[in-house]
Swiss-Prot record:
Name listed for the protein in its UniProt record: Beta-galactosidase-1-like protein
Organism: Macaca fascicularis (Crab-eating macaque)
Enzyme Commission number, as recorded: 3.2.1.-
GO molecular function, one term: beta-galactosidase activity
Glycosylated residue positions: 97, 243
Active site: 186, 264
Length: 654
């Protein structure tokens, strides 16, 4: 419920600071005191020590638990993004229900005595699909994202005219807990340097939210020139390995007076498929925080609880090559992906307690964990067997292949089909020119798996077939770019494939609704498919199993499997990529499972190769840094704590 009068939230906020005074209803304020380089909350000196938590990466039933642990850690504020694409899946269609209920999350934060620093974008990065921008923007292929392009501004205006009035009652001076709002996100790193765009956003925020709310920007030190704007308070972001004195000195060139603010102090870092799990040492993170607090700076720790990229929501980076972000967003944060306190949390709480009061009482204990299995999965059938169910509307036909965006397929998978126009007796090279596979293509001839083509890889497949042979290419969107100078990351086959010297034409595109099929699987009469002797290529496996007694959080381990997608009782857990790593387990919150003997169902879509024993197991610890080359007896004994490798800190990218 939104606050109706200023007094209703005031009592909740009293424990936030020793210096917080009892304000009258008309004196609630959060402002910059430039004369004394500090913030004032209701007229009293105030400094926030905040942490990032993304409601869209945490199931709603777990919000209160995570927020309570953040408050116990000594934080007096939280910071979070609002992903546009999470709330407006199609133009003019809005969703604020369930885990998308932003107002409910604001209320949970208030109940936990936490102020809010809101970052509504429109672009958020966050290692989230397309940086939070909806992919339907790309249905206008020439659109210039994050600029003053009229098409982009029209879409932004329409979205903010829905979003910002919803949060208006929650502004601090209106009785809510939102003390400040970020405009855009690290705009200086984008490269456009379009000040007209930033001025338009600032004007839109003021028109819809009024003059009292503090608006600010955040950039890495190299992005301050193009990311800051007069009238918006300038803040910076950096991690424990960076030179704090040098960066804050640079910040003073853009914001000579007022409090120093690090809006993203990195407690850890993200993971990419194919690279080591990133960690940051407890000593480095705590030392950096203490040094900033000694300067009187306000700090937000990114992340304090990372959560999970469920479903298809992970983003991607392009650092010389395309890098897809893992399903786990554990981030080596003070609160683990499963919501458990880590040694980093207790060390940070000790630092915070030197500068401000922290709540008394015991921290809620770690959630109970459980182990189940191993379970042997059963072959359901090849993906092609269910094509009529996966694409009930039938294919879209075109001479040349069309992108996901052109056929309104936002995420997931699309099947491309054509037929060989002549017999090919010898193995003949097959490829897609100009790096035109976005992002992975699983190639089949007459239903037989031939191999994979991957973005940024120059590999070719060698195909044979008779005239009229069916050529199927299942293309996977591995997540749109979420950071960098170009967010227009189109998916699918961007160029027509070539077989030998022949450009292939006459395509059928099947946008697949796999989640719908899995969710309602038990209602359907499934067609029979002849089981291949050695199953390979995109294939469904499943297993029903009971859990006797109560359930606990657990981690799904898929030893020997290659790459694919997993559903538990119809819920899309996300991607696994056992062969590439580093992530080897998927977090399964206990509320997804049925207890006391009720049947649960796990469904896998394995895209490449199945192990000789198609088994999975639920573990009581995560494995976030490993590869499938480790022996199973060894891999089960490892955890993220024992398999961590630090990497150089990067200044920005969130």
């Amino acid at each position: 419920m939104a606050p109706k009068k200023p007094s209703c939230l005031r009592s909740l906020l009293l424990p936030l600071s020793l210096t917080l005074l009892l304000p009258q209803a008309d004196t609630r304020s959060f402002i910059v005191d430039r004369d004394h380089d500090r913030f004032l909350l209701d007229g009293a000196p105030f400094r926030y020590v905040s942490g990032s938590l993304h409601y869209f990466r945490v199931p709603r039933v777990l919000w209160a638990d995570r927020l309570l642990k953040m408050r116990w850690s000594g934080l007096n504020a939280i910071q979070f993004y609002v992903p546009w694409n999470y709330h407006e899946p199609q133009p003019g269609v809005y969703n604020f229900n369930g885990s998308r209920d932003l107002i409910a999350f604001l209320n949970e934060a208030a109940l936990a005595n936490l102020l809010v620093i809101l970052r509504p974008g429109p672009y958020i990065c966050a290692e989230w699909e397309m940086g939070g921008l909806p992919s339907w923007l790309l249905r206008k292929p020439e659109i210039r994202l994050r600029t003053s392009d009229p098409d982009f501004l029209a879409a932004v205006d329409s979205w903010f005219k829905v979003l910002l009035p919803k949060i208006y009652p929650w502004l601090y001076h209106n009785g809510g807990n939102i003390i400040s709002i970020q405009v855009e996100n690290e705009y200086g790193s984008y490269g456009a340097c379009d000040f007209s765009y930033m001025r338009h956003l600032a004007g839109l925020f003021r028109a819809l939210l009024g003059e009292k709310i503090l608006l600010f920007t955040t950039d890495g030190p190299e992005g301050l020139k193009c990311g800051s704007l007069q009238g918006l308070y300038t803040t910076v972001d950096f991690g424990p390995a960076d030179n704090m004195t040098k960066i804050f000195t640079l910040l003073r060139k853009y914001e000579p007076h007022g409090p120093l603010v690090n809006s993203e102090y990195y407690t850890g870092w993200l993971d990419y498929w194919g690279q080591n799990h990133s960690t940051r040492s407890v000593s480095a993170v705590t030392k950096g925080l203490e040094n900033m607090l000694k300067l009187g700076a306000s700090v937000n720790m990114y992340m304090f609880h990372g959560g999970t990229n469920f479903g298809y929501w992970n983003g991607a980076d392009k650092k010389g090559r395309f890098l897809s972000i893992t399903t786990s967003y554990d981030y080596d944060a003070p609160i683990s992906e499963a919501g458990d306190p880590t040694p980093k949390l207790f060390a940070l709480r000790d630092v915070i307690s030197k500068f401000q009061e922290v709540p008394l009482g015991p921290l809620p204990p770690p959630s109970p964990k459980m182990m189940v299995g191993p379970l042997t999965l059963h072959l359901v059938g090849h993906l092609l067997a269910f094509l009529d169910l996966l694409c009930p509307s039938g294919p879209i036909r075109s001479i040349l292949p069309m992108t996901f965006e052109a056929v309104k397929q936002d995420r997931g998978f699309m099947l491309y089909r054509t037929y060989m126009t002549h017999t090919i007796f010898e193995p003949t090279p097959f490829w897609v020119p100009n790096n035109g596979v976005h992002d992975r293509a699983y190639v089949m001839v007459d239903g037989v798996f031939q191999g994979v083509l991957e973005r940024n890889m120059r590999d070719k497949l060698f195909l044979m077939g008779k005239v009229g042979s069916k050529l199927d290419i299942l293309v996977e969107n591995m997540g749109r770019l979420s950071f960098g100078s170009n967010s227009s990351d189109f998916k699918g086959l961007l160029e027509p494939p070539i077989l030998g010297q022949t450009i292939l034409t006459q395509w059928m595109m099947f946008p697949l609704k796999i989640d719908n099929l899995v969710k309602w699987w038990f209602l359907l009469q499934l067609p029979k498919w002849p089981y291949p002797q050695a199953p390979s290529g995109p294939t469904f496996y499943s297993k029903t199993f009971p859990i006797l007694g109560s359930v606990g959080d657990t981690f799904l381990h898929l030893p020997g499997w290659t790459k694919g997608q997993v559903w538990i009782n119809g819920f899309n857990l996300g991607r696994y990529w056992t062969k590439r790593g580093p992530q080897q387990t998927l977090y399964v919150p206990r509320f997804l499972l049925f207890p006391r003997g009720a049947l649960n169902k796990i469904t896998l879509l394995e895209l490449e190769n199945v192990p000789l024993q198609p088994q999975v197991q639920f573990l009581d610890k995560p494995i976030l840094n490993s590869t499938s080359t480790l022996h199973r007896t060894h891999i089960n004994s490892l955890s993220a704590d024992t398999l961590s490798a630090s990497e150089p800190m990067e200044l920005s990218g969130h």
